[in-house]
Amino acid sequence: MSDNGELEDKPPAPPVRMSSTIFSTGGKDPLSANHSLKPLPSVPEEKKPRNKIISIFSGTEKGSKKKEKERPEISPPSDFEHTIHVGFDAVTGEFTGMPEQWARLLQTSNITKLEQKKNPQAVLDVLKFYDSNTVKQKYLSFTPPEKDGFPSGTPALNTKGSETSAVVTEEDDDDEDAAPPVIAPRPDHTKSIYTRSVIDPIPAPVGDSNVDSGAKSSDKQKKKAKMTDEEIMEKLRTIVSIGDPKKKYTRYEKIGQGASGTVFTATDVALGQEVAIKQINLQKQPKKELIINEILVMKELKNPNIVNFLDSYLVGDELFVVMEYLAGGSLTDVVTETCMDEAQIAAVCRECLQALEFLHANQVIHRDIKSDNVLLGMEGSVKLTDFGFCAQITPEQSKRSTMVGTPYWMAPEVVTRKAYGPKVDIWSLGIMAIEMVEGEPPYLNENPLRALYLIATNGTPELQNPEKLSPIFRDFLNRCLEMDVEKRGSAKELLQHPFLKLAKPLSSLTPLILAAKEAMKSNR
């Protein structure tokens, strides 16, 4: 101990990671980090034989003599299904009938022959996921067909060598010419807030409360006519506030640029409050109707652990969304630049669980929990943000089967496109806790396809140095990362876990935030 009293009063600087993990390859697989990030071409259509159109309800081939006699009115193509027959020979360990594009992806995926033979169905699932372009988002996402007579996932694979049908749906979309989504080794972490603007449509309640009717109600929802641009603008005018945001807010300073718009900080003239304002050019939004859903959802989500929606304005074709501003930046800055202790990790987990308990109680699944989407105040406050992927669930649709979110944080039931519920957020929270320990999520340095395969088949990921963690922390992680969804803890249950009782005051995060900002400044 020093004899200098002044030095004793000054706390030691928080530990800093020797190098940022954001752009590192981790040394695990240097080749995997160099995989191509170019948009993938569409699945090539086979010339022989011609692709068959499968009847949505009966599953039978169209074009029979009966159809020729009936001569029904021909309407424009809708919900087109390109059926691909893929088989797997368990003896040779080879797939048969696989599209050339899928075969090329598999060849460069680093999924070994042994892994392919061990679980060929998982291989097909991740190939279909990776190559799908049915939903255009900043990060890879997928909506599987949910038609009567079809399972929600890829059809079961016959491992004896006979063919199976992998249904690839080509939806009638507004942005059908857009390039397929791409998975990056890790997306550039959020410098500030709000990099996406669209969410999945909120399921409308249906009359039949029987859960078994979910497929039919989902089918009805998909048949709902799309809103025209004029209808969307009219609806927005009924939601937003009247006025010019450039008169109500001053000192605009650009802090970020996302695919959906530009983000500024500004000051409320009347209150003197600093806010974040996202300016969105609606003409550049392919799915404008989803913005309405996002605003309506955000208006309802008022909670101390959620970055709160404040106001919105419409000026011409420009939509201004005003949100609470947190100057501490994202948790990603802290986990990649500093080392957190267990008590600090417990504090962050507690705050996030409080937000999730609130969301889940209101039938909302966030679906994209990760450090990028956790924002920090300079005083240490912790808040969830970015509801670009959130979804509301109703008693009639208590499970969802869309594949949405950022792959490395996805729960296995999402990757394999099984029906899922709010506990997908708990799995992602567990992965985020590993981020706080190791600086990155598991499999980040793997080829994306292999990462998806490992998530689908490996179950709970292994820690790099589990012996360094306390038994109580390991138990908390196990409760979050339980493969059996029924055994996985809920937000309400985990808030009672003994690990959270170790949490330090939120003010203990401030030195980490400052250290991260300093480290990032030095790295520039």
UniProtKB/Swiss-Prot annotation:
Query: Where is the segment annotated Autoregulatory region?
Result: 69-137
Under InterPro entries, the record lists: CRIB_dom, CRIB_dom_sf, Kinase-like_dom_sf, PAK3-like, PAK_BD, Prot_kinase_dom, Protein_kinase_ATP_BS, Ser/Thr_kinase_AS
Q: Name one GO biological process term.
A: intracellular signal transduction
Where in the sequence is Phosphothreonine found? Answer: 60, 134, 143, 154, 159, 169, 402
N-acetylserine occurs at: 2
Phosphotyrosine sites (modified residues): 139
**Catalytic residues?**
367
Per UniProt, the ranges with Acidic residues bias are: 169-178
Q: How does it assemble?
A: Interacts tightly with GTP-bound but not GDP-bound CDC42/p21 and RAC1. Interacts with SH3MD4. Interacts with SCRIB. Interacts with ARHGEF7 and GIT1. PAK-2p34 interacts with ARHGAP10. Interacts with RAC1.
Which family does this protein fall into? Belongs to the protein kinase superfamily. STE Ser/Thr protein kinase family. STE20 subfamily.
> Under which name does UniProt file this protein?
Serine/threonine-protein kinase PAK 2
Organism equals: Mus musculus
* Gene behind the chain: Pak2
